[in-house]
């Protein structure tokens, strides 16, 4: 195995840790981003586990830049025993945290917000470098973390239980929220910072410690975030395991999911893995919060403002190269405006190249709007999906599809519009790539039926100017998703509302709204301040 000497934070980031690994020099592009966060630029091994101490002696994970294929970092992950140790440390830390008054936890959260705020641009660039989303989206993702810290700080003084009237004289009923203990956070590659942020902020403010297993392909984002949080915890006399980190792959994830010392597992990822995770957590009667795949539709009705719809669809279908859980994958067009709207879309899609308005290229270049897919495996899934649609009789409507050469290697593909056959399986599955499937409808009822006729239930949007259609869309006969928008695209939610989806998207809610209520154990407490012992419902039990 690899010889690892740990890297204390105070050491210069470029220090050579292991002669076997410290032989490479990075591109100036990657070095600039990593140095801004004090991450090594010489290929030395980076400890990928933190439970108060940095360490890790599991397998080495390579972080690969999706835009260039360059190895930008090597991370020594946690092994199974170390994961168990970290879980125990997190459990111990939860006892200290739950004793801390909520508003004091709020003050710690405010300081975390400041630490993140000071590095928003640098961290955003790391998201772009490691995940591949464009610069403004990388920064936007960190901003979401900052925003949820603000929200959580406020929540620290307002998380309210309830006082309820009792039917018995001189009795009162309270509903009381208390911390759960340990929240395990398993996150997906496509939001390597924000998803953790939503969970950390709400879990911590409600008095829980956390243990985070990030995606195996975005360990550097996780390490950088944890390094920003670490000094804040230390300054406030809190153990590091209040926000533990275990980089690793499936085995590490399974340790967390299966551990009865992890009171709640907040899992963000695919439906396939989420189903497994949900069953394992259920089997031990733990709590699971599942945020799984989406298959999101936009409906453009005959009375829609087409220019607005166009902007929204392009951002949600092409943005993040189709790699948001909320990306638009299905587009239902009223027959009367369909041809016009498709030609408006194609004007943009067919102009997309490294030279034109919908510019594809280095996500770190401010002018780029289309970045790469995250891995070469994702390119293959994109290609297979397109081949399958065409084999089954569907058509590609865009001039170009397939791999795109922007002159820097990487996993770039052409955003593609397709017209699959009506019964094509692509309508009901999430392909995590910029493929937009189009079909027509004649009535709003039919469009709503099409929107709802898939297993997933994350996000849906209706473009209309008709108030009756709006009412229908939002009501009991309307869209069945967790996010139901009008004249706003399917992606780009704000943190104020609860975020999550229904059906096979997992029914979880994170972030704002009432999401915090899932991170606590609720007790209903009836208190008798009389000198009698009456029973509820007038029951008489003559003693
Ligand atoms: P994924 O399911 O492949 O992996 C998610 C996480 O699970 C990773 O950390 C992975 O290492 C871990 N994992 C894999 N097998 C495991 C197991 N058996 N036990 C425990 N952990 C295991 O997902 P991904 O490819 O990283 O992310 C893309 C998916 O995430 C898409 O389906 C997307 O829609 C979804 N997503 C959903 C939301 C949401 O809020 N609904 C947000 C972001 C992403």
Spans of features found by a protein language model:
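Residue-level signal for inorganic ion chemistry
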Residues: 69, 105, 127, 207, ...
């Amino acid at each position: 195995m690899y010889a690892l000497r740990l890297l204390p934070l105070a050491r210069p980031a470029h220090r050579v840790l292991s002669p076997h690994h410290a032989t490479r020099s990075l591109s100036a592009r990657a070095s600039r981003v990593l140095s801004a966060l004090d991450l090594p630029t010489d290929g030395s091994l980076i400890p990928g586990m933190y439970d108060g101490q940095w360490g890790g002696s599991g397998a080495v994970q390579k972080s690969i830049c999706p835009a260039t294929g360059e190895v930008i970092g090597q991370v020594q992950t946690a092994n199974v025993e170390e994961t168990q140790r970290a879980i125990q440390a997190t459990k111990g830390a939860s006892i200290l945290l739950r004793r801390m008054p909520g508003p004091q936890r709020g003050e710690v959260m405010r300081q975390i917000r400041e630490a993140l705020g000071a590095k928003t641009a640098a961290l955003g660039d790391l998201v772009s470098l490691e995940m591949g989303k464009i610069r403004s989206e990388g920064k936007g993702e960190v901003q979401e973390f900052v925003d949820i810290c603000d929200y959580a700080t406020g929540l620290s003084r307002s998380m309210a239980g309830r006082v309820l009237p009792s039917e018995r004289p001189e009795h009162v009923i309270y509903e009381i929220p208390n911390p759960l203990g340990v929240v395990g956070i398993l996150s997906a590659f496509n939001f390597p910072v924000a998803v953790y942020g939503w969970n950390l902020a709400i879990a911590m403010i409600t008095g829980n410690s956390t243990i985070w297993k990030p995606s195996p392909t975005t360990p550097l984002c996780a390490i950088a975030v944890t390094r920003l949080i670490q000094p804040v915890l230390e300054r406030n006399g809190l153990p590091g395991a209040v926000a533990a980190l275990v980089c690793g792959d499936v085995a590490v994830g399974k340790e967390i999911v299966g551990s009865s010392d992890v009171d709640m597992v907040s899992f963000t990822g695919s439906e396939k893995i989420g189903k497994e995770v949900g069953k394992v957590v259920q089997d031990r009667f733990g709590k699971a919060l599942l945020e799984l795949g989406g298959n999101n539709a936009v409906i453009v009705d005959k009375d829609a403002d087409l220019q607005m719809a166009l902007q929204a669809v392009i951002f949600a279908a092409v943005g993040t190269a189709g790699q948001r859980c909320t990306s638009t994958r299905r587009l239902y067009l009223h027959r009367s405006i369909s041809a016009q709207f498709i030609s408006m879309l194609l004007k943009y899609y067919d102009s997309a190249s490294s030279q034109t308005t919908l510019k594809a290229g280095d996500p770190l270049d401010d002018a780029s709007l289309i970045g790469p897919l995250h891995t070469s495996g994702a390119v293959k899934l994109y290609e297979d999906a397109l081949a399958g649609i065409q084999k089954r009789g569907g058509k590609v409507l865009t001039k170009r599809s397939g791999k795109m050469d922007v002159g820097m290697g990487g996993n770039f593909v052409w955003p593609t519009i397709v017209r699959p056959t009506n019964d094509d399986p692509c309508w009901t599955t999430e392909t995590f790539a910029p493929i937009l499937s189009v079909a027509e409808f004649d009535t709003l009822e039919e469009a709503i039926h099409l929107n709802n006729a898939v297993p997933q239930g994350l996000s849906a949007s209706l473009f209309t100017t008709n108030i009756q259609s709006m009412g229908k869309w939002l009501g009991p006969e309307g869209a069945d998703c967790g996010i139901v928008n009008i004249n706003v695209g399917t992606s780009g939610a704000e943190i104020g509302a609860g975020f999550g989806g229904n059906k096979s998207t997992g029914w979880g809610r994170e972030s704002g709204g009432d999401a915090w209520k899932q991170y606590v154990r609720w007790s209903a407490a009836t208190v008798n301040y009389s000198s009698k012992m009456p029973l509820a419902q007038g029951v008489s039990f003559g003693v």
